[in-house]
Structures are given as C-alpha cells and as structure tokens.
Design a protein with these regions (language model features):
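Residue-level recognition of a conserved intra-blade site in WD40 beta-propeller repeats
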Residues: 56-58, 100
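Blade-edge beta-strand/turn elements of extracellular beta-propeller
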Residues: 38-45, 83-88
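A flexible loop/linker signature enriched in serine peptidases of the S9 family
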Residues: 3-31, 42-51, 65-76, 91-93, ...
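Short loop/turn segments that connect beta-strands within beta-propeller blades
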Residues: 34-38, 79-83, 124-128
C-alpha cells in the first residue's frame, strides 16, 4: 500500500533533518506499507522536492508523481521494487495534472512553461516520448510576451534560490525599467 504524509507522520520515519529540528509540514513524502508484516518504509526521505499528485500504474507497477522541483513542477517515476526515482522527460516546466492509462504504458498530462499557455500531451512511457495533442497557446495570439530568463540567488547560508525574471516586450538594455517583485 502506498501512503503519503509529512516527514513526521508514522513516528517520524520520513524525517531527514538534524535531531531537534522540525521538518517542513508541507513537504509531503511517500511510504510503502507491506500488508502482511505491517512494516512501513519511507520511499522519498532523501528526495528533496515536495511530492504532490501520485498515481500507481498497474501496467508497469511504477508510481508516477509530480513534485515541486525548484521553481517548476516536474513529473517523476518511482520503481518501488528497486527504490529508484527518475525524472520523466516532458516538454513543459509545470506539469499541472496527469492521468495514467489503465491498460497501456502511457499517460496524459497538461502543463505550461514560462512563455506558453496550457498544452495537453500523451507520453509513451516505454519510448519516453511526448506527443502534443492540444495547444491552447493560440489563445495568447494577441498577447505580446517578453523574454523569460533564469536567475539564481545564493543567500547568506549558501542556499541557492532558483527563480526567473521576465523582460518586457521589445526590451532595450539601454533603457531603465521598473522592477516588479
């Protein structure tokens, strides 16, 4: 049985912080419970992103889930037997929802990136290939978008905060612009 909860649930077996520290209560983790022995094993204790939507595929016996990965929401595959997690290669930065096929090795998802609207894809999980099925970007045809660039900041503790900034359309580096934070 697949369980989801905070690091402190189930007696704190998902905690991955120093003794005396309290883990984040919005950091959802995955656990596997053996029904016969009632033993529970943390599957994502050392996995940094916060686990979000989760589906166990009956076709390949893998768990597919989305997770907050820096400033994106990525799609991941967990093989419970091997305790292996890998990122599923998809063409969008934000996977907003997905559904796994019941009898085929595929899933559908919708997502978006910094400079496009929602798009719907079908992913062949054996080939690790995405096929675009629906593109709502046409809804933005009259909207002029500027460029989006990655921007990382290192705080005083040495933590890297990943972010991005957006330049206005027709950006001229010789002009001054207000910054909206």
């Amino acid at each position: 049985v697949l369980l989801a909860g905070t690091p402190e649930c189930l007696g704190g077996i998902g905690k991955n912080v120093k003794e005396g520290q309290t883990p984040s209560m919005i950091d959802n983790q995955l656990y596997l419970m053996d029904l016969q022995s009632k033993q529970i094993e943390p599957l994502t204790r050392t996995f940094n992103p916060n686990v979000m939507q989760t589906v166990w595929s009956a076709v390949d016996n893998c768990v597919y889930f989305t997770a907050e990965d820096r400033d994106c929401i990525a799609l991941f595959r967990l093989n419970p037997a091997k305790k292996h997690i890998e990122k599923v290669n998809v063409p969008e930065e934000m996977v907003l929802g997905f559904s796994v096929a019941e009898k085929a090795s595929s899933l559908s998802f919708y997502g978006e990136s910094a400079s496009n609207s929602h798009r719907l894809y079908v992913v062949d999980l054996k080939k690790d290939a995405s096929k675009l099925e629906e593109d709502l970007n046409g809804e933005l045809k009259d909207v002029l978008l500027g460029e989006c660039k990655a921007w990382d900041f290192v705080n005083s503790r040495g933590d890297t905060i990943c972010g991005r900034y957006y330049l206005p359309p027709h950006f001229d580096p010789n002009k001054k612009y207000p910054m909206i934070v």
